[in-house]
Amino acid sequence: SDVPVHHRTDHDRASLLTGSSRKSSVDSAGGSLFEASSRASSPSSSSSSECSDTESHDIHSLCSEDDCQEVLRQILQHDQPVHISIKLHVTEDQSTNWMSILNPNNNILYVAFPTDFAPAGSKETFTSLL
């Protein structure tokens, strides 16, 4: 379809409400938003070297708030609905995948509950997603 696809992966279990820094990954069907952002010349590009090797399995790790803000800015630039996939890690071994579509025309984010929604940590995962 002609809806851009973006994937975000949350690696730590800290809630957004606590203000803790989060490490995440973003993919898109048309290429990486992070790679297309200011990785080569921005001051935040040095933060990517601070990412742990355990995250190397992800396509692109976002290690700073500036990186996350740049990805969000690029997602919000679309004038057509954007498909966003969010992977939240509940534990080291368990994660849930949330599929969503952001419609920029009416500023509504549609979120589908994951089919593999595990009872363990489900409240925390849902709160973290919000």
Curated annotation (Swiss-Prot):
Q: What Gene Ontology molecular-function terms does this entry list? A: ornithine decarboxylase inhibitor activity
Q: Where is the composition biased (Polar residues)?
A: 17-27
Q: Which family does it belong to?
A: Belongs to the ODC antizyme family.
Transmembrane residue ranges? none
Recorded GO CC terms: cytoplasm; nucleus
Q: Where is this region: Disordered?
A: 1-56
Q: Does the keyword Lipoprotein apply?
A: no
Q: What does this protein do?
A: Ornithine decarboxylase (ODC) antizyme protein that negatively regulates ODC activity and intracellular polyamine biosynthesis and uptake in response to increased intracellular polyamine levels. Binds to ODC monomers, inhibiting the assembly of the functional ODC homodimer, and targets the monomers for ubiquitin-independent proteolytic destruction by the 26S proteasome.
| UniProt keyword annotation of Mitochondrion present | no
Keywords (alphabetical) are:
Developmental protein
What is the originating organism of this protein?
Answer: Drosophila virilis (Fruit fly)
* GO biological process annotation, one example: viral translational frameshifting
Ranges of Basic and acidic residues composition bias in the record = 1-14
What spans are recorded as compositionally biased (Low complexity)? 32-51
- Encoding gene (name): Oda
Question: Which domain of life does the UniProt lineage start with?
Answer: Eukaryota
Report what the protein is called.
Ornithine decarboxylase antizyme
Coiled-coil positions: none
- Tell me how this protein assembles: Interacts with ODC1 and thereby sterically blocks ODC homodimerization.
